[in-house]
Amino acid sequence: LDFLGRVFEDRFLIADVVMRAEFPSQRWFWFDPPFNPEQSALLHRQADNVWRIDMQLGPDADPEREREPAQVIPRIRRMLGPDVPFDLEWTSVYTFKCRRLESFRSGRVLFAGDSAHQVSPFGARGANSGVQDVDNLVWKLALVLVGEASEALLDSYDAERIPAADENILNSSRSTDFITPKSNGSRALRDATLDLATDWPFARALVNSGRLSRPATYR
């Protein structure tokens, strides 16, 4: 089965560190910061004094080398500052895709979650949309299995969840294009938006570091 959509080449470092710091708990996002020039970075707090760090590395980064503590720790020190103690808990390097299967049903096989559609992590759409898939599907399966509905009911799963997946893919792709612009024009537009957002409220709504998902409306 083939996927329809885009594969993004940029690599990202993801790291969990344990630290006691006075950073605000809300998510921080940096565009072109001095500690990661021409790239992006993210920091947000999790439970038990664990902080998640996400850094764009670019398409040419060596994933094996970038996972090594000798490479990761200096990057994090440049981000947090030399006087912030931390313990490195976990690291990985990833790429991502924004795509879906042409159909979420193939005979008696039904696809949900990442097996049906894949999106970037910006906007928390991956696991959330998988739960929505299952919520749409399980009651239909139950009715078919006990003979209270025909198998044709399962076709509505595909018809309803594909538009929802397309909406997530569209918004996830837009977030990714804003965070990781691929052309000089896209970068200039992004940077102008960020500059205007400093003083103009209308521009703040245009800053896109990951539009959060919304419930799908079935028509």
Predicted stretch roles:
Residues 88-90, 94-175, 179:
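Conserved mid-domain beta->alpha element of the FAD-binding
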Residues 60, 74, 143-219:
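Helical substrate-recognition/capping region of FAD-dependent monooxygenase/halogenase enzymes
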Residues 8, 17, 99-101, 106-109, ...:
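Short capping/connector residues at structural and topological boundaries
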Residues 8, 65, 126-127, 182, ...:
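Aromatic-acidic/polar surface patches that form glycan- and anion
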Residues 1-96:
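Conserved FAD-binding catalytic core of PHBH/FMO-like flavoproteins
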